[in-house]
Amino acid sequence: MHARVVTNQIQPGKMDEWVALIRDSVVPSLRDEAGFKGFVVLTNAEAGESIGYSIRDSADDMVASEASGNYQQQIAKLGSVLAMPPVREAYELTVLD
């Protein structure tokens, strides 16, 4: 499996809105993409930080997701709560237990 990891700095007082946007817009948009397995979001409201993990079956599924333009559409919806542009990285995911 593979994961796209997106690190975000959230504006002060906007974490609840951030989580709602992820839950109500981002995750539903990902469900229709090939190879989508799930989404995990970690939040630290005190620090205004959030890390999102989008899990895919394969590297090819991640490439197809990037090419679809969905990421850019979702970031546009999230712009009102972001303090700065997100940082994206890709990893191979190994589940040990």
Question: What annotation goes with each model-predicted range?
Answer:
Residues H2, T7-Q11, K37-A47, Q73-D97:
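Glycine-rich beta-strand-turn "strand-cap" elements at beta-sheet edges
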Residues Q9-I22:
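Short, surface-exposed ligand-recognition loops at beta-strand->loop->(often short) alpha-helix junctions
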Residues K14-D16, D60-M62, L96:
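Residue-level signal for secondary-structure boundary sites
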Residues K14-E17, V27-S29, F39-V41:
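Intrinsically disordered, low-complexity segments enriched in polar/charged residues with Gly/Pro
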Residues E17, E33, E46-E49, E66, ...:
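Glutamate identity and glutamate-enriched acidic tracts
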Residues D24-S25, L30-K37, I55-E89:
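An amphipathic, aromatic/His-enriched active-site/gating alpha helix that lines ligand/cofactor pockets
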